């Protein structure tokens, strides 16, 4: 299924489940998220982290992921190289990768309350946010 670019702001990476996308859209009708496998016919699947981050920047997409080990490092490398990325939302270790309900509540709550209005260029946010 091909997705339209204008309606999306968030891109779920290949290590997140399609269930996160579905659960988010059940909570918030037309929530602006798409899974990478559906985005541009899956052409971004398998891109290395730096290329994916820069592609998200060019497309105006914020990447949603679990990869706390390498994505922040790659985002820093992109910025140090004088390039930009579209932003990154990472789930903290306390968020189980199979708890799609909790993930979707965190993401939709954050996005609706504040994230949608932010300038996401080169920004990284961890959910849940620290108190």
Q: Which functions belong to the PLM regions below?
A:
Residues 45-47:
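Active-site metal-coordination segments of metallo-dependent hydrolases
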Residues 1-3, 54-55:
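Short, conserved, surface-exposed binding loops centered on an aromatic residue
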Residues 49, 56-78:
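Acidic, metal-binding active-site segment of PIN/NYN-like and related structure-specific nucleases
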Residues 55-60, 108-112:
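A general structural signal for short secondary-structure boundary/capping elements
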Residues 3-4, 9-14, 18-40, 50, ...:
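Acidic, PIN/NYN-like endoribonuclease modules and their adjacent C-terminal/linker elements
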């Amino acid at each position: 299924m091909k997705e339209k670019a204008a309606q999306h702001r968030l891109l779920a990476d290949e290590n997140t489940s399609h269930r996160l996308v579905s659960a988010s859209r059940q909570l918030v009708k037309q929530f602006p998220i798409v899974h990478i496998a559906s985005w541009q016919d899956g052409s971004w699947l398998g891109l290395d982290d730096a290329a994916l981050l820069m592609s998200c920047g060019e497309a105006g997409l914020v990447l949603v992921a679990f990869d706390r080990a390498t994505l922040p490092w790659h985002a820093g490398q992109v910025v140090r190289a004088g390039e930009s990325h579209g932003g990154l939302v990472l789930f903290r270790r306390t968020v189980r990768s199979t708890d799609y309900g909790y993930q979707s509540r965190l993401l939709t709550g954050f996005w609706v309350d504040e994230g949608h209005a932010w300038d996401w260029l080169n920004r990284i946010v961890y959910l849940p946010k620290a108190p």
